[in-house]
Amino acid sequence: MCDSHQKEEDNANTSERALFFNYHEFSYSFYEDLGSEDAKPTEHDEDHKLCITHFPNVYAARGSAEFQVTRVVRVPRRFDESRSSLETPQFSTQLPGSEPAAIVGDDGTSFVRCGRYDIGDHVFGCSSVSPLSEYLSAAELAEVVHRVNGFLLREEGEVFGWRNLSGLLLDMLTGGLWSWVLGPLLSRPVFQESLALEQYVAQLNSPGGLLHERGVRLVLPRRSGCLSLDFVVPRPK
């Protein structure tokens, strides 16, 4: 049985532990209410700020048709779940808006439009829920991110594996001749894991794939510098 002193210590440790949230989102209080008659931006109080949860599609040419009709939802990296996540990118498996420190509303995991903000008159909600919730369930997102995280872990294992490290040492001893002659053979597993991730993403985005059928596209992590796992979604209206 746990005594009261131990319980107090456990509660203190829990309260001091930082809660995870999507650090890509931010709030904004000066915006135009949807359905307002004057259609002019006004200042809102703390409880009615917009949560900016989708962003310009930087993977499309600015001014292009795709840029105009799509937005990007960013799933953040997690650094707190394992030591390896500090070296190897590992992304949150939680649907944006369901994180422990997310801003929540009365509508649960539904993306509810509240107001317009930004030059392009983009529509946002007042909670951390993003438009991605309209296309993927929490379980579907978790499955996709688990697979991506697994590919990245295996790729990192090959990068720091004996083949690659031996090749680096031999490269130093031979003045680069090793890489020129036999390096590609030993580095092949690294490229195979990278190729496997690319193939998985291509499968999701191709006809018949989960994301393609939902009108969503996953961006390869390397294109964002592995700072976030980006999903291209239709622009909310």
Curated annotation (Swiss-Prot):
Q: How does the UniProt record describe the way this protein sits in the membrane? A: Peripheral membrane protein
Outcome of swapping residue 204 to P: In ERF4-3; loss of function
Q: Which family does it belong to?
A: Belongs to the ERF4 family.
Q: Where does the sequence pass through the membrane?
A: none
Outcome of substituting residue 148 to K: In ERF4-2; loss of function
Q: Which Pfam families match?
A: Erf4
- The molecule here is called Ras modification protein ERF4
Q: What is its main location?
A: endoplasmic reticulum
Q: Which InterPro entries match?
A: Golgin_A_7/ERF4, Ras_palmitoyltransferase
What keywords were assigned to this record?
Endoplasmic reticulum, Membrane
Which BP terms from GO are recorded? protein targeting to membrane
Q: What organism is this sequence from?
A: Saccharomyces cerevisiae (strain ATCC 204508 / S288c) (Baker's yeast)
Describe its partners and assembly state: Interacts with ERF2.
Listed under GO cellular component are:
endoplasmic reticulum; endoplasmic reticulum membrane; endoplasmic reticulum palmitoyltransferase complex
Q: Which function does this protein serve?
A: The ERF2-SHR5 complex is a palmitoyltransferase specific for Ras proteins. Palmitoylates RAS2, which is required for its proper plasma membrane localization.
At the top level, the lineage of the source is Eukaryota
Give the gene symbol. Answer: SHR5
Result of altering residue 128 to P: In ERF4-1; loss of function
Annotated compartments = Endoplasmic reticulum membrane
What else is noted? Present with 937 molecules/cell in log phase SD medium.
Taxonomy of origin reads:
Eukaryota, Fungi, Dikarya, Ascomycota, Saccharomycotina
